[in-house]
Amino acid sequence: MKAVSPVRPSGRKAPSGCGGGELALRCLAEHGHSLGGSAAAAAAAAAARCKAAEAAADEPALCLQCDMNDCYSRLRRLVPTIPPNKKVSKVEILQHVIDYILDLQLALETHPALLRQPPPPAPPLHPAGACPVAPPRTPLTALNTDPAGAVNKQGDSILCR
């Protein structure tokens, strides 16, 4: 999904870090059409929370909290493994996001069409002495072969699946 950076209208300046109610609603309406049927209701609720935070005080911390809560709401809608009618904590949302990303990575690595393709051509070599040659890096996929083993510890059985 493409990141969206709204442009602030030239009128009243909102507190730093906060996009303003109407702007957030318009931005979500323009770019969030793939979020499903409840996107308009969620955008209206997010705009109302932002307006309430702006009206209460012009503190950047309130706007930041508003923005973070909106991000968690968006993650909850975008990740299909999160149960839609169950209350989940922010930690559980992040765990579902991590699991979903790992599932997508595995699907990409094992996709038959990608396995049959020849490797991409090597980048052009630098002229002698212009740039030192660094040793090749180990891909992250090789380092993260068993993410459950690296995360699960004796006392973490409640937090990690």
Curated annotation (Swiss-Prot):
Pfam families: HLH (PF00010). GO terms for cellular component: cytoplasm; nucleoplasm; nucleus. Heterodimer with other HLH proteins. This is DNA-binding protein inhibitor ID-4. PANTHER family: DNA-BINDING PROTEIN INHIBITOR, DNA-BINDING PROTEIN INHIBITOR ID-4. GO terms for biological process: astrocyte differentiation; brain development; cell population proliferation; central nervous system myelination; central nervous system neuron differentiation; cerebral cortex neuron differentiation; circadian rhythm; fat cell differentiation. One of its GO terms (molecular function) is transcription regulator inhibitor activity. Disruption phenotype: Mice do not exhibit a noticeable circadian phenotype. CDD domains: bHLH_dnHLH_ID4. Induction: Expressed in a circadian manner in the suprachiasmatic nucleus (SCN) of the brain with peak levels between CT16 and CT20. It comes from Mus musculus (Mouse). It is found in: Nucleus. SUPFAM superfamilies: HLH, helix-loop-helix DNA-binding domain. Residues 52-104 form the bHLH domain. It comes from the Eukaryota. Keywords: Nucleus, Repressor, Transcription, Transcription regulation. PROSITE patterns: BHLH.
